[in-house]
Amino acid sequence: MGAGLPCGGAGHRILIENSEYWLRNYGDLAMLDVTVRRIRTRWPLATVGVMTESPALVAAYFPGVLGITVGSRDPWGAPGRVERLAAAVGPAVAGPPAVAALRARAWLLPRAVRVRDRLRDLRSRGSSTDEPQPAPEPSHAEILAPRIERRHPGAARAVREASLVVALGGGYLTDADIPQAGRVLDLLEYACGVGVPAAMVGQGIGPLRDPELRERATQALGKLPLIALRERRRGPELLESLGVPSSSVVVTGDDAIELAQNVRKVSPGNDIGVCLRVAKYSPVAARAQEIVGATLRAAAAEFDARLVPLIIAETPGSPDRATTLPLVRGSANPVEPVGSFVRPAAVAAQVGRCRILVTGAYHLAVFALSQGIPVVGLTSTEYYDDKFLGLADMFGGGVRLVHLDDPELSEHLPAAIRAAWAEADDVRAALRARADEQVLGSRNAFERLFGLLERTHTEHA
């Protein structure tokens, strides 16, 4: 990568809008890991901040990086005692108490908000009996800045005092995750409004049909000089329909590929990796879960392979551990899953011991394909169809899609597993080569990203 800013970026602040504020998804952590390392390599003296609900977990996973909450009073201030301790002991020790605090806050916060709103209603009823006069409808721009500054003062100040804002990769710009999509779009548009360079990397966009969300995306995305996409099957056309100039769009592949690339093994594995994602955005009937488990256990016996339960998400809404471990019970000698607070490279390395992967989780497929391992993708929604088909397109194959609501699931899933097993040796080199190409494309996009700040610095020098 290029020379970077003078003095190694000292005095500059890079704000990362993280795609998962609890840091409980190893795919998101992998993208964050790659992004932080690239920024530190380019600008070793710059200050890096990550939007989060747990500054302690940010410090545990990334010592020296600031965790910034939406309510931070001094977002770029020095880390506190808890964060310094978390950085010293790491995620395995800091993780359990940090998540306990997050869960307690998640339970208390909505109740506190309801009490506040009731008190506000009571005060407003007693304050005046006059009929309120209709006010002119304010524009979106007039609403956005005051709303962010009032509701999320820490985020607003972090943006205003940043040198560059980067929205981390993810699949959140979609109808399946409207609250998070709105949060990210607001932050990016606010950054543009206060004159701070902003960009998006590693994005998987869509399906996006909600009229309100499309309008918000049109307003925000068209202002960005760079949007890097992880797939080309849907994203470029969707962005074009939103009025985003093609000159701002580049297809790179997923940024997490680089992390998996770095843990590749010389020899192929002989195990079957498995993860079943069951969530509101990925519903799976109980009968389908039973069929998946029985099929996997039969495949392990047929190929004399061990089943490897793989965990990518440990969020309350996507508890992969709870939905995956039952699938391997009853199989001969299953592999132990990773612990609850490991680093993403440990998950990618465990994927590397497999000959094939059967997964309902997107980033496990990224980890597998990047190491030359074919994938059977389990899907029940258009959202996951797009994710897996986008990967198949970027890697030139290596993915077989199986629909969990298919009436013939008990026939189609075993056939897909056998086909993936049979082709594993033949596709290994080609999949790895496609992964290497995508890493290069991702790094080139980061060169453009770095240029946003470096050009601004030169112009104002």
Question: Where does each model-flagged region fall?
Answer:
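Active-site anion-handling motifs in enzyme catalytic cores
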Residues: 1-461
